[in-house]
């Protein structure tokens, strides 16, 4: 055995109970068909000892992360913010919901939000020169950033979604004949 960890440890690391149950059930049991995602009610209904395996199960953290990420994406913004509150207790719930609207798709477990949220909570220290593309100059870069800022400022808070932001920035690039990279 490697890395024996209790259920409580996984919960403390931000793994959802439904992901743990789903994953552990499939470690020793194979359902009929290809279905991998099961609700607790579905597991109870579908489970049979005849389909249980006697061979030793191999724990795969990547697979558990896949299950957990799936269940995280199924949560509503308020529900997910409430679950993440223990990892960012100093953040207001409405601000956390906004961060999660962007980062939700990238989370494998809830604990990861504390690291991913840092970019939204404080400006990182960086060298200004990294903003300037190789085939550009300071003036062109500043112009592009100002155009992007103006476009983003016109998007209402309730439309602050990944797709909306990408479309707005792509429009700035197209309308102003900017080079993307």
Spans of model-derived segments:
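Alpha-helical recognition segments enriched in aromatics with Gly/Pro capping
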Residues: 1-72, 174, 178-179
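Small-residue-rich helix-loop
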Residues: 77-175
